Amino acid sequence: MRQQYFVKFCKETDQRAADRDSWKTFSGLPQELELPSAPKQFIQYLEEDNRPQVSLDVDYENGMGISVGRLREDTVYDWKFVGLSHNTVRGAAGGAVLCAELLKAQGYITKKL
């Protein structure tokens, strides 16, 4: 599902380069725990002006990753960008599996004795 997002910061700042680096290096708990269905790199930032595109980027990290691009300044908010994820793989089925893996890894789901 491709969406356009808007971001407004509390303080006036130019975070364009920092934001790109943050997206490129972001790692969450599923990556730290190396869960089986977690993508190795959760977010990929694409520099091209025409990316992300569904036909090229929806299957990033077997559909479990997020593709982000077209970061630009906005007149109403501070920044806007486009985000793309696979609605079925990342959203419904894969998201549920990843949640179950995380619950097991954190000890909320245990083997019944």
Role assignments for model-derived ranges:
Residues M1-D78:
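C-terminal substrate-binding/catalytic lobe of Rossmann-fold NAD(P)-dependent oxidoreductases
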